Amino acid sequence: RCSIGDYRFTEDYVKLFYKHPRGMVGVDSSMVDDRVEGVYPPWGRPGPNTYSAYPSFLNRYVKEQRLLTLEEAVRKCTALPAEAYNLEGRGTIEVGSYADILLIDWENLRMNSTPRETRRYPTGFVYVFVNGVAVIEKDRHTGARPGRVLRRKPDPTSSI
């Protein structure tokens, strides 16, 4: 097993990682309240990946560089992490799975954050369903919070 942060390595190395059949996308972030300004910089604002990691990945490696197909990229963001962490019923759309679904307006998928203002939500995520409940409708949060902490099931064949 291996992990990589795209801020630590050269772009060529990152591309090699993402092209590998087992290379997957993950986000190391924290929970933030977007209505509150922190007191001491740089902790006052979260990093840009807190709001825009996945649109950034999709735009950069699928749209712009054509490193991956959309299908490959989606798998690296969904099914592969669910498999790696043994999250049953997650990462695929099939009978018996949780209804976690994202509908993207591909032409209008954009990061809206800037280095000075990182707390801007992306556009182009038209609908997001978590456990079958709409949490985003037409790029706006519905107020619903059906998510929960996911705990991996032990995998007897894993070394971690």
Model segments located where?
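Active-site microenvironment of metallo-dependent hydrolases
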Residues: 1-160
